[in-house]
């Protein structure tokens, strides 16, 4: 960590040492922060069709290679959960990533405005500004953020924005064996994602809707147990050593 970031954290600690804690819901944060980058004509979102996901972790591996995340740290992964409904216990595969919310709670808590939302809805981190305080990590209700132990800055899925801007698909979408991940512009009614959302409107779900974050990762075939606060206990990923 460079000296300017270290000095900022020291000053932040002095300022907050004697401060009273205020619940986030009562804090005077703006949940409509200024957006920049991207185009207002687009709104990127992802649809995950769980009927097609086989848990192969190709998305996890390709993302790690594309974005060069440190070993053991991932921007996306597929968790396996056991869910009990009545007397029946089933295993459920659930791909997890940043939800690129319309009301992202990670943005207003950043003391240096390193986390921001682009005009096209993609939430990104400016690593040149991030001081690694981890406020955004704690604020994210989806556990989609982590502090990269190599860069000492916040890290997360960006929908591979560098690839989107080059006319390419995100690494996870391109590598998905079952074609379970679909990304596109939901402001374009002719886009594949828009048509799928329209066709399966009643079956489309999001994680933790009670948080009112307006997530833009949609799930098709999601078990009802995951719509309410996450139930079921995460098992080790199938490809990891335990």
Predicted regions and their residues:
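Non-ligating segments of multi-cofactor redox enzymes
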Residues: 1-242
């Amino acid at each position: 960590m460079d000296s300017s970031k270290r000095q900022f954290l020291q000053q932040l600690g002095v300022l907050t040492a004697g401060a009273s804690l205020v619940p986030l819901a009562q804090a005077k944060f703006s949940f409509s922060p200024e957006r920049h980058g991207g185009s207002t004509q687009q709104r990127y979102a992802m649809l995950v069709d769980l009927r097609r996901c086989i848990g192969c972790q190709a998305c996890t591996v390709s993302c790690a290679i594309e974005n060069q995340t440190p070993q053991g740290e991932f921007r996306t992964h597929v968790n396996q959960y056991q869910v009990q409904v009545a007397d029946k216990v089933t295993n459920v595969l659930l791909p997890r990533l940043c939800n690129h919310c319309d009301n992202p709670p990670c943005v207003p808590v950043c003391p240096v405005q390193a986390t921001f939302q682009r005009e096209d809805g993609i939430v990104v981190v400016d690593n040149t500004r991030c001081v690694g305080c981890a406020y955004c990590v704690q604020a994210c209700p989806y556990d989609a953020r982590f502090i990269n132990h190599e860069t000492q800055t916040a890290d997360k899925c960006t929908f591979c924005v560098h690839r989107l801007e080059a006319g390419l698909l995100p690494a996870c979408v391109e590598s998905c064996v079952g074609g379970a991940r679909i990304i596109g512009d939901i402001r374009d009614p002719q886009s594949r994602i828009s048509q799928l959302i329209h066709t399966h409107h009643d079956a489309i779900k999001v994680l933790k809707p009670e948080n009112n974050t307006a997530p833009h990762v949609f799930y098709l075939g999601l078990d009802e147990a995951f719509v309410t606060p996450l139930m079921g206990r995460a098992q080790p990923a199938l490809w990891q050593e335990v």
